[in-house]
Amino acid sequence: MIKLSNITKVFHQGTRIIQALNNVSLHVPAGQIYGVIGASGAGKSTLIRCVNLLERPTEGSVLVDGQELTTLSESELTKARRQIGMIFQHFNLLSSRTVFGNVALPLELDNTPKDEIKRRVTELLSLVGLGDKHDSYPSNLSGGQKQRVAIARALASNPKVLLCDEATSALDPATTRSILELLKDINRRLGLTILLITHEMDVVKRICDCVAVISNGELIEQDTVSEVFSHPKTPLAQKFIQSTLHLDIPEDYQERLQAEPFTDCVPMLRLEFTGQSVDAPLLSETARRFNVNNNIISAQMDYAGGVKFGIMLTEMHGTQQDTQAAIAWLQEHHVKVEVLGYV
C-alpha cells in the first residue's frame, strides 16, 4: 500500500545543509498498522510528511496504492491526497465551526451533495464515538474528543491510508489508550492502512503489527513488533523496549547495594525474558541444577505483537561458583542477565 524507496530529504538553511533523511526505504502492506519510532529530531515527522508529499523528497520514490506520487501534477496530486488521511499532535480544528462542520469541511471542498455530507458525517461521528456532539464547538471538547473529531475529518474522503503524526503525544495516558483502541478498531472495521510515528514504545506495543526504528535520518531496524521485542538488533531498539518495562531498585536495596562483591554477599540480578523464556520454569530449574535460591524482589510482564516479555529483579543465593554457572545457564536459555551489584 505504501512503498518508500531510497528516500533522501535535504533542507537548506542559508549556507547550512541538513540531511533529514538518508536513503530510507519502507514498505507498509495494505491493512497493516505500521509504527515508526525514534527520538526527537530523528527524522520521523519528515518521513511521514514525505508519504503525502507535504515534504517533497530530494531523491527517491513514493508509491501509494501503486501510484507514484512524485511524478504527479499539482491537480493529480490533490486528487491522490484524498486517498491519504492525516492526523497530527495538534488537532487543527476550526474554532468557528461545530463538530459537524469540521468533519464536513473536506466534503464541502470536494463539492459533495449536502444530503451525502449529512449521511457521511453522521456515520463518521458515530464511528468515533461522538454521535451526540454534532452541534458542539471545539472549545467545549476534551483533548481526546478533539482528536476523535480530527480522525473523523481525516476519514471523510474515505481514504485508503491514514497517517498519524505523534497523534497521542498531547494526551494523557488514559485518553491515549482510548485513541489507540479507536485506531485499532478503525483498522479492523475499514481495513485501513495506518502509518504512525511516535517516540513512545508503548504506542507501538499496543497497536502496531510492524515497527521501524529511525535514528539520524536512517532506518536502523525494522521487523514485526513481536520479532523486535523478542530479538532487538540495535542498542536503540533495546533502549525503547526497556522504556516500556522499567523496574526501580527498592530504596532499602539501593542503600545496601555495592558495586564489588564482599564477604557473605549475594548478587542482585536484572533478568529480561522474551518469547519462550517467559513461560519456561527457568528459575526453579536453576535451583535444582545449581543449588541456588532466587529471592524475587519485583517483576513485571506484558505483551507486544502477541509475544509475552518481562523483567525481574532477584537476589541469587549460592556459592560464587554455583551462581556463575546458573547465570551462564540462564543466558544460554535466552535470558538477558545483568548483575546490578551485590547486597
From Swiss-Prot:
Keywords: Amino-acid transport, ATP-binding, Cell inner membrane, Cell membrane, Membrane, Nucleotide-binding, Translocase, Transport. The keyword Transport applies. Part of the ABC transporter complex MetNIQ involved in methionine import. Responsible for energy coupling to the transport system. Disulfide bonds: none annotated. ATP binds at residues 38-45. This is Methionine import ATP-binding protein MetN. It is a peripheral membrane protein. NCBIfam families: ABC_MetN. The keyword Chloroplast does not apply. It catalyses: L-methionine(out) + ATP + H2O = L-methionine(in) + ADP + phosphate + H(+); D-methionine(out) + ATP + H2O = D-methionine(in) + ADP + phosphate + H(+). It is an enzyme of class 7 (translocase). Residues 2-241 form the ABC transporter domain. It comes from Shigella boydii serotype 4 (strain Sb227). The gene is metN. Its EC number is 7.4.2.11.
